[in-house]
Curated annotation (Swiss-Prot):
It comes from the Archaea. SUPFAM superfamilies: Ribonuclease H-like. Its cofactor is Mn(2+); Mg(2+). Its EC number is 3.1.26.4. GO terms for cellular component: cytoplasm; ribonuclease H2 complex. GO terms for biological process: DNA replication, removal of RNA primer; mismatch repair. The keyword Cytoplasm applies. The lineage of its organism: Archaea, Methanobacteriati, Methanobacteriota, Methanomada group, Methanobacteria. This is Ribonuclease HII. PROSITE patterns: RNASE_H_2 (PS51975). Manganese or magnesium. Binds 1 divalent metal ion per monomer in the absence of substrate. May bind a second metal ion after substrate binding. InterPro entries: RNase_H2_suA (IPR004649), RNase_HII/HIII (IPR001352), RNase_HII/HIII_dom (IPR024567), RNase_HII_arc (IPR020787), RNase_HII_hlx-loop-hlx_cap_dom (IPR023160), RNaseH-like_sf (IPR012337), RNaseH_sf (IPR036397). Belongs to the RNase HII family. It comes from Methanothermobacter thermautotrophicus (strain ATCC 29096 / DSM 1053 / JCM 10044 / NBRC 100330 / Delta H). Endonuclease that specifically degrades the RNA of RNA-DNA hybrids.
Amino acid sequence: MKVLGIDEAGRGPVIGPLVVAGVMIPERKFSILRKMGVKDSKKLTPERRRFLARKIRRIARVFTVKISASDIDRMRERGFNLNEIEKIAIKRIIPEAQPDRVIIDSVDVKPERLEEEIRSHFGEIEVTAEHGADTRYYPVAAASIIAKVERDLEIESIQKKNRKLGDIGSGYPSDPRTREFLESFTYDELPDFVRRSWATVQKKKQ
C-alpha cells in the first residue's frame, strides 16, 4: 500500500511562503523511516532535518507546494482563510501522488470534516486526518521534515537576495529581528515577500 503523509511549514510567519509537503512511501518501508530517526521536525535540529531530508528523498517520493507571501495575500483578499489556502495545496499534491491512503496533519479544527472533504473530492481513497499526526505517523513526520527544510531554504534565499534590506530574521512575528526589519518600512514600501494581510503588518496602515 502506497501511503502519502502531508504536513506544512510556515503557517504563522509574516515573511516567506507557506510550504506544504507530501511524502509517499510503501507501508513496508515505514520501518526504514523509524530506523533513520524520522520524527516531528520540531524535535530535530536544523542540521538533523537537512540530513534526514536527503535520506527521505532517496527512499520516498516527495512533493512540495510553495505558496508565496504575495499569493497568500491575494487569496486572503478574495476571502480565503489560511486553512482553505492550505487545503488548496493538499488537493494539488494528492492527484500527483495517487496514493492508496493519505494521512494529513489536520488543518481543520474538526479533522473528520477534512477527511470527508478529501474523500468527496477524490472518491475512493482512504483518508486519515488528525491533529498531531506528525507525532504518530512516519510519512507525516517525514513530510514535516521536508516542509521545514524547504521553508528554511526559502528564507535563506530571500535573505541572500535582499541582503541590502537588512536582516529578516526567522520570519516569525515573535522574532525581534523580524520585527525590527518590518519597522524599517512603511506599509507601502514593504517587499513582496512580506505577508501584508498579517495583523502585525496591517497595524502599519493605521
